[in-house]
């Protein structure tokens, strides 16, 4: 007989394999992962693609809280292509690392972000 201290399997554990099979048998449409999206795309379009990628990816579906699309799942996809942005419109604001709108925190610039490739010489 089983020990009385053993925890019975949860509903989710019992249905895990069945859910996996049903998911992959439905042949979900998955978006390809692009590390370098085409240049000249507005940040709105690339963030929409980011949303679609995290929604459609079978890997993200089983992370975190059962694939409900929590913010924990989304950050893994969005951190892939953060760029270092130099804000030249306002003197004294310097450089800032921005992954979103690229305004460098000043809010005054509406120009597209200037992408600077981070190299060892820039760090020295």
Swiss-Prot record:
Residues 97-107 have a biased composition (Gly residues). Residues 30-124 are annotated as: Disordered. Phosphorylated with a circadian rhythmicity, probably by the double-time protein (dbt). Phosphorylation could be implicated in the stability of per monomer and in the formation of heterodimer per-tim. Transmembrane segments: none annotated. Keywords: Biological rhythms, Cytoplasm, Nucleus, Phosphoprotein, Repeat. Forms a heterodimer with timeless (TIM); the complex then translocates into the nucleus. This is Period circadian protein. It comes from Hirtodrosophila pictiventris.
